Amino acid sequence: MSESLKIIFAGTPDFSACHLQHLLSHRQKILGVFTQPDRPAGRGKKLAFSPVKILATQHHIPVYQPHSLGLKEEQQSILDLDADVMVVVAYGLLLPQAVLNMPRLGCINVHPSLLPRWRGAAPIQRAIWAGDQETGVTIMQMDSGLDTGNMLYKTVYPIQPDDTGASLQAKLAALGSQDLLLTLKKMAEGKMHGETQDEQKTTYAHKLTKKEARLDWLLPAAHLERCVRAFNPWPVSYFIINEQIIKVWEAQAMPDSQQVSHLQPGTVLKADKNGIQILTSEGVLNMTKFQLPGKKIISAWDFLNSRNEWFQIGKQLLS
């Protein structure tokens, strides 16, 4: 394998840690790890290590946590490591051109989409949200643009009808880890050649927001179902009733019937152990798993046992 390559790894969340673990499991030479500074987390707001820092510390790998890489002083540690390549996976900091030029073979990035589709911050979730039938992983040679570099390795992966943001991320992390190792092997052998991206096919995966997670009954049920799946585990789709935010963790789109054509979107059609059914502009959304503020996730049946009066047949929910 590519044991001869000296690697700097840059990443922060669980998705990144999966890739680092795979490299370590295959005895890759990791000179150092760059990750985001420790952040307050949890109810106590105590400083917490990133998943990548936790893993690196367990393996006694030097950890660097600059707030930016814009100054020469901050870049010196990369230069001092004298790496062959820098592997970047969901790091969260911009890499200036000076940094991109430092490793002998430059910097490569693992991006969980089929570039140039879904460049940007939330490619996994946007693929589900848009109703894509497939996605994948692209490993690219980094340049100064946003996910615009030449593609080194690309693998297609089907999106299942029940995939969520969480489940698809786990699948693509496993796929990306394998592809990364293959890419490094080919780079070490001098057999890797890049392919330019087709700018005409570019789409952008903008950051997710809590505002867009609110369910709008004026949209089709099929789209709302995709939102529920895409926004799991964050920011989580929700609706508001009696001034309370109710998160929806699971829902299915269903066809409506002729008998409801006179009703307005947002109308409660049915509420039982199988779910709470709400009419939309096109079809019915059957919601089956919920979470009240500060509470655990519960089934529709448990929700109705405590809040049945909220979902009387014919009641109108606000968008």
Swiss-Prot record:
GO terms for molecular function: methionyl-tRNA formyltransferase activity. It catalyses: L-methionyl-tRNA(fMet) + (6R)-10-formyltetrahydrofolate = N-formyl-L-methionyl-tRNA(fMet) + (6S)-5,6,7,8-tetrahydrofolate + H(+). Its EC number is 2.1.2.9. One of its GO terms (cellular component) is cytosol. The keyword Manganese does not apply. It is an enzyme of class 2 (transferase). (6S)-5,6,7,8-tetrahydrofolate binds at residues 113-116. Keywords: Protein biosynthesis, Transferase. Belongs to the Fmt family. PANTHER family: METHIONYL-TRNA FORMYLTRANSFERASE, METHIONYL-TRNA FORMYLTRANSFERASE, MITOCHONDRIAL. Attaches a formyl group to the free amino group of methionyl-tRNA(fMet). The formyl group appears to play a dual role in the initiator identity of N-formylmethionyl-tRNA by promoting its recognition by IF2 and preventing the misappropriation of this tRNA by the elongation apparatus. This is Methionyl-tRNA formyltransferase. It comes from Hamiltonella defensa subsp. Acyrthosiphon pisum (strain 5AT).
